Amino acid sequence: MSGKPTLLAIFSLFLGVLLNGQQTATQQASTATDTKQPSTLSVTVKVVNVPATVRDKHGQIISNLAKDDFVLEEDGRPQAVRYFAHDTDLPLTLGLLVDTSMSQRRVLEEERHASYSFLDQMLRQSKDVAFVIHFDHEVELLQDLTSSREKLESALQTLQIPQFNSAGGNSGSQGGNGGGPNNNGYPGGRGGGRHGRGFGGGGTLLYDAAYLASDELMKKQQGRKALIILSDGVDRGSKLSLDSAIESAQKADTIVYAILFKDDEQHDRGGFGGRGGFGGGMGRHGGGHRYPEEERPDGKKILERISKQTGGRLFEVSKKYPIDKIYGSIAEELRNQYNLGYTPDPADAEGSFHKIALKTKNKDLTVQARDGYYAGR
């Protein structure tokens, strides 16, 4: 009889220990859960990226500088370089903007072959993408962002100067209303624009093309970004201004390189007004804008301004400096860029423009970089 109470006491003691252990384990699990899920504060920090190319006094690219070799200012105030890289491992997005107005009819074949060779040389299949846009009286995306060399080559093959029929209408150069092989671009008169942003009209819509390429395509991309414009630089009929085109590239952190092909005969002065002549346009007879000779814009100065303010360069095609050699120079720059970043004042008003000045401590070196950025974008 005396063994039963003892056994009961032992059982009660065991049960108490077990329950206490479960409670302790539960408390520990709760504590562990609390430890794994701390409250967090998310802070978005704006970083201004400044890609740069450095040359010596002979024009040779310098590629062995360190972060401390640079001096960076915003609106005259020194800035600390928070991020610095000098490698080409970042993804690259390239955009080709090809002028297909009548002024470029003599050079289009040369542009086509050199452009494909450049893309074939630059694109890495796993990282890089490119797109092709043509512009004349409309802006059309012939090939959207892709890493496929075959698709890009196909788009370049569709580039043509417009043909005009005997009745004075634009017969279309790329399949009538069908456009190019990827007619999902910004056509002004061939089936609607991408995201509704296409601008149609008469002339050569250079500014519209540059704006749309930056705002619709480049702005969404990460890494290194460069637009290459092949044109004589004279805009006819754009709805947007030169300032708007430059601003869109700056907001998209996109460098613009310009390849200038001069129109020796100035064919468009005779009344074609670009590809939109003899039809289409915005209610103007003959399509496009016809500049009197004394009012004709300086296309070289226009392209120089676009490229300089975005950190790029203007190249002028000549017998001594053909387009394939120019593409080689652009490729060399893209392979030897420095990427600097700094954090601006968060109190800057949204949309306000701020001047950037980047130089090296060595006064014999010249830095090529963007000249500013827009806050809060």
Please provide the spans of the model-predicted regions.
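Positively charged n-region of N-terminal signal peptides that target proteins for export
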Residues: 1-5
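Scaffold/interface architecture of coatomer-like assemblies
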Residues: 21-377
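Bacterial N-terminal signal peptides
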Residues: 8-20
